[in-house]
Design a protein with these regions (language model features):
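Compositionally biased terminal segments of proteins
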Residues: 1-214
Length: 214
C-alpha cells in the first residue's frame, strides 16, 4: 500500500459514520416484547450486556441466553412472530433473523455454562439506549468472557476487564462460577490487578488454591 493509499484509508476511517442502530433496536424491542408476553425465560448477553455493564461498544446482533430446555420454545415463539429460525448447532446455539437482524439463541456457553435459577435471580435490569433490558449477572459475564476469549476475539477479554472496572462484583459468587475456568479467570484477574483494577488478592489466592487442589 502506498503512502497516498494509507492516507486515504485513514481519512475514510476518520470520516466513517456511526452505524445505524435503529434496525437492531427495533428487532430487540420486538424480541423482548414477544418473549416477555409469552413468559419465556431469557437474559441478554454479548455486546448489549457488555455495553450495559462495562464499556460501550458497537454490536451487530442480539445475544439471548436461555436454559437448554427453553431454547426450542424461544425459537418457536420468535417464529410465530415472523422471524426466520434455524437450529444451527443443537448442542449450544440456535439462530433467528428478522429484517436482516440476527438473534443468537445461546443455551450453552463457555465452560459449559447454562442458565440456572441463581443466575435468573441475580440478573440485573439495566438501561440500554432508552429501554430497560435484563442481562446476565456481571459475575457470570466476566467468567464466560474470560473462558471464551481467544486471539481472534480479544473483545471478550477487554469486555471482562471493563466490567471489573465498572461494576461492584459479588466476588464470592464469581468464585463459585469460576470453577469451570479457573486458569482463565486467574489470568484475567492477575492482569486486572496489574492494571490497578479492583481484583481482590484473596480471590486470586482462592483460585490458586483451587488449582493446587485439582
Amino acid at each position: 500500500m502506498t503512502n497516498a493509499s494509507r492516507d486515504e484509508e485513514r481519512l475514510r476511517l476518520a470520516l466513517r459514520e456511526e452505524p445505524d442502530l435503529a434496525p437492531l433496536l427495533a428487532v430487540l424491542d420486538e424480541t423482548i416484547r414477544v418473549l416477555d408476553e409469552n413468559g419465556v425465560e431469557y437474559l441478554l448477553m454479548g455486546g448489549i450486556a457488555s455495553s450495559c455493564l462495562g464499556r460501550e461498544r458497537w454490536t451487530h446482533d442480539i445475544d439471548l441466553f436461555t436454559r437448554p430446555a427453553e431454547a426450542a420454545r424461544v425459537l418457536k415463539t420468535l417464529a410465530a412472530e415472523g422471524f426466520e429460525t434455524e437450529e444451527t448447532y443443537p448442542e449450544w446455539l440456535f439462530k433467528a433473523r428478522k429484517d436482516a437482524q440476527l438473534v443468537d439463541v445461546i443455551f450453552r456457553s463457555g465452560g459449559n455454562t447454562t442458565v440456572d435459577d441463581e443466575m435468573l435471580r441475580r440478573a440485573p435490569t439495566v438501561p440500554f439506549m432508552g429501554r430497560l433490558v435484563r442481562t446476565v449477572p456481571p459475575e457470570d459475564l466476566v467468567v464466560i468472557k474470560a473462558i471464551v476469549a481467544a486471539e481472534h476475539t480479544p473483545r471478550h477479554w477487554y469486555d471482562a476487564l471493563a466490567i471489573i472496572a465498572a461494576t461492584e462484583l459479588d466476588w464470592e459468587y464469581l468464585l463459585r462460577r469460576a470453577r469451570q475456568g479457573v486458569r482463565r479467570i486467574l489470568s484475567l484477574l492477575l492482569y486486572a490487578q496489574s492494571n490497578d483494577l479492583p481484583a481482590p488478592s484473596w480471590v486470586i489466592r482462592d483460585l490458586l488454591s483451587l488449582l493446587e487442589g485439582a
